[in-house]
Every structure is written in C-alpha cells, then in structure tokens.
C-alpha cells in the first residue's frame, strides 16, 4: 500500500505548535485546494485530551473561519487528527503558512475569551455525537500553551521521511 502524504514526514523531528502545508491540488474548475497540518503538540511526546480536542473542534472551526475566510480563501473543514496532536484544515485557496499561523493565534485568543461551557457552539444532543465529552478548561489550557510556545512554520523538505527508516 502506498504511503499517504501525511505519513511521508518524519514525526520524530516535527516541531509544535506549527503549520505545515500538507497538500495542494486543483478542483476540476481550476480552483486551489490546500490542506494544512496544524500541529498543536509534538507527536509521540504529548497528546491532547479527548475532551480538550473535542471542545477545540467545536470552537476552532468557527474562529478560524472568522479570521481566515476572505475573498480568496474559504475553509472547507477543520478536523482533529486521530493521533490527537493537532488538526487538518482543508480550504479553497492557497494562503501562505504565516497567514494561517496568524489566524490560528487569533483563534486561540478567542478560545481564551469563551466564558462558560454553555457558550460552546453545537453543545447539545442534537448537534454533537458525544455532547457530554467536553472541557472548556482543557481547551483553554491547550490554547494558552499554543500562544505561549508561539506557532512556527514547518519545512516539508526538512521533515521528509527517509523511507529506509521504516523498512
């Protein structure tokens, strides 16, 4: 089975928090689609709590749209990684990594401003598949660490996986 794009980078040297342009492609009509790796914590060193990443999923998607969507960019989806170290963001357009990092930082500030658990969007049995599995406190702690550590930009060439390491 061929390696997927997300597994062609060496996770042992991946910095966090950091933005990586994971993939670019075109729609049939010629529009750019870009996928970003938004790595919150270093792989295999830290892991985001289930409740924290779930709450981030509800908050981050809206706040990123507030800060990044424009005439040349429209976010399609922001989804948590199964490894719980970050999110993938797919969008129409091709913003540079620093623009994405700036929107991410602003979104983390917004998360710190959320007052109460009841202020989390779609936090109900009708709109969320695990509506009781949330922690605003964990989400704020994650946001605070991201801001404290400062978001960097990853270099795909520097992270290229030496496939001989995996046999």
UniProtKB/Swiss-Prot annotation:
Keyword tags: Autoinducer synthesis, Iron, Lyase, Metal-binding, Quorum sensing
Top-rank taxon: Bacteria
Cofactor details (free text): Binds 1 Fe cation per subunit.
Pfam family, one: LuxS
UniProt-listed GO biological process terms: quorum sensing
Family: Belongs to the LuxS family.
Function: Involved in the synthesis of autoinducer 2 (AI-2) which is secreted by bacteria and is used to communicate both the cell density and the metabolic potential of the environment. The regulation of gene expression in response to changes in cell density is called quorum sensing. Catalyzes the transformation of S-ribosylhomocysteine (RHC) to homocysteine (HC) and 4,5-dihydroxy-2,3-pentadione (DPD).
Protein name: S-ribosylhomocysteine lyase
Gene that produces this protein: luxS
